[in-house]
């Protein structure tokens, strides 16, 4: 929005030309989202406390979590607000990739909001019925994927980028829609499963978003895309603004979500952020890179799948409790130790993922 305004004002003052620089807009996008999140934090927490929107804690969970009962939840609203405002201010409104991310972010946020509302207001511990949650998540994911396929069919938009192989970029055809669906829905649920400890989900989200900001910049730059042997996508550059907004909003939220948390993001935040990371990976053609950089989310999800599968097939559990972060809690690890170690692993995986762009 401000970019368009600056383009009209630059004829009166050349200094407005700075708004056309992607690097400048990426920095101010991060700062804008950060300050909005920090400003909203105390007000949001006070409002949630007044409304008695407190966290519901399972009785069969770790005993250390009982003290979290009643902590304000649905704080993801301030994350989404900060991201959306920052993106609308600093990204080109005409960029279709930006709108794809916003559709998934807001759509999944609404689904998460309904789920949280049923849990904390109606006191329904199950929240939104699972089949309806997956139905609406699927509708959004398939709608966006199908639209992208129609526009980018038989172009680099629908190619699959395979790590370590610079000349292996097969056209996916209709499989593109199916892959995109699983990436978007899967990442949304993966981040949701990871959001079980104070700050555990938000920091890996920040790391992955920061990594994708660098990838988006390279993908939207023809010279760097050719140098790294990745598809050049002319709309990808504006995703830098989206990614830095996620980083800023996430850091602002972490200020209040760090142990011991003053507020939790709830499903409204975790589903939306996960969905956003998923669609960003799809738009950049870096689904494999998401698996590497978002390895913490992948392991958390696999731990649940293995736990459920093992119990149904063998009647035995693999972990003391799933997702796996609860397993380490029950082994006696203090919560901050689990959180920080998962952060360190996440940062390492993002750096490894970025390194794969050059190792081809």
Swiss-Prot record:
Pathway: Cell wall biogenesis; peptidoglycan biosynthesis. It catalyses: UDP-N-acetyl-alpha-D-muramoyl-L-alanyl-gamma-D-glutamyl-meso-2,6-diaminopimeloyl-D-alanyl-D-alanine + di-trans,octa-cis-undecaprenyl phosphate = di-trans,octa-cis-undecaprenyl diphospho-N-acetyl-alpha-D-muramoyl-L-alanyl-D-glutamyl-meso-2,6-diaminopimeloyl-D-alanyl-D-alanine + UMP. Keywords: Cell cycle, Cell division, Cell inner membrane, Cell membrane, Cell shape, Cell wall biogenesis/degradation, Magnesium, Membrane, Metal-binding, Peptidoglycan synthesis, Transferase, Transmembrane, Transmembrane helix. It is a multi-pass membrane protein. The chain crosses the membrane at residues 26-46, 72-92, 94-114, 132-152, 168-188, 199-219, 236-256, 263-283, 288-308, 338-358. It holds the Pfam family MraY_sig1. The keyword Metal-binding applies. This is Phospho-N-acetylmuramoyl-pentapeptide-transferase. It comes from Salmonella paratyphi C (strain RKS4594). The lineage of its organism: Bacteria, Pseudomonadati, Pseudomonadota, Gammaproteobacteria, Enterobacterales.
């Amino acid at each position: 929005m401000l970019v368009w305004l600056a383009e009209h004002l630059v004829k009166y003052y050349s200094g407005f030309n700075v708004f056309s620089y992607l690097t400048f807009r990426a920095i101010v996008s991060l700062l804008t989202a950060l300050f909005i999140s920090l400003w909203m934090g105390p007000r949001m927490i006070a409002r949630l406390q007044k409304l008695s929107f407190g966290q519901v804690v399972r009785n069969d969970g770790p005993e250390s979590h009982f003290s979290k009962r009643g902590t304000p939840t649905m704080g993801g609203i301030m994350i989404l607000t900060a991201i959306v405002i920052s993106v609308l201010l600093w990204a080109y409104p005409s960029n279709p990739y930006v709108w794809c991310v916003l559709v998934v972010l807001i759509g999944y946020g609404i689904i998460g909001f309904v789920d949280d509302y049923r849990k904390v207001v109606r006191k329904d511990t199950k929240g939104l019925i699972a089949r309806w949650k997956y139905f609406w998540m699927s509708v959004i994911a398939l709608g966006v994927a199908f639209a992208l396929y129609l526009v980018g069919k038989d172009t680099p938009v629908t190619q699959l980028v395979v790590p370590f192989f610079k000349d292996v970029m097969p056209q996916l055809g209709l499989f593109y829609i199916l892959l995109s669906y699983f990436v978007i829905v899967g990442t949304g649920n993966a981040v949701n499963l990871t959001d079980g400890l104070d700050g555990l989900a938000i920091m890996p989200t920040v790391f992955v978003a920061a990594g994708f900001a660098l990838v988006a910049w390279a993908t939207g730059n023809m010279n760097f895309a050719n140098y790294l042997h990745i598809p050049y996508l002319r709309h990808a550059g504006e995703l830098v603004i989206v990614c830095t907004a996620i980083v800023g909003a996430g850091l602002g939220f972490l200020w209040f979500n760090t142990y011991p948390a003053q507020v939790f993001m709830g499903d409204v935040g975790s589903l939306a952020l996960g969905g956003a990371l998923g669609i960003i990976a799809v738009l950049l053609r870096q689904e494999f890179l998401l698996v590497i950089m978002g390895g913490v989310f992948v392991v958390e999800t696999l731990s649940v799948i293995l736990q459920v599968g093992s119990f149904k097939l063998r009647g035995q559990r693999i972990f003391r409790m799933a997702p796996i972060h609860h397993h380490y809690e029950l082994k006696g690890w203090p919560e901050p130790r689990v959180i920080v170690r998962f952060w360190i692993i996440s940062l390492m995986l993002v750096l490894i993922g970025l390194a794969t762009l050059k190792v081809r």
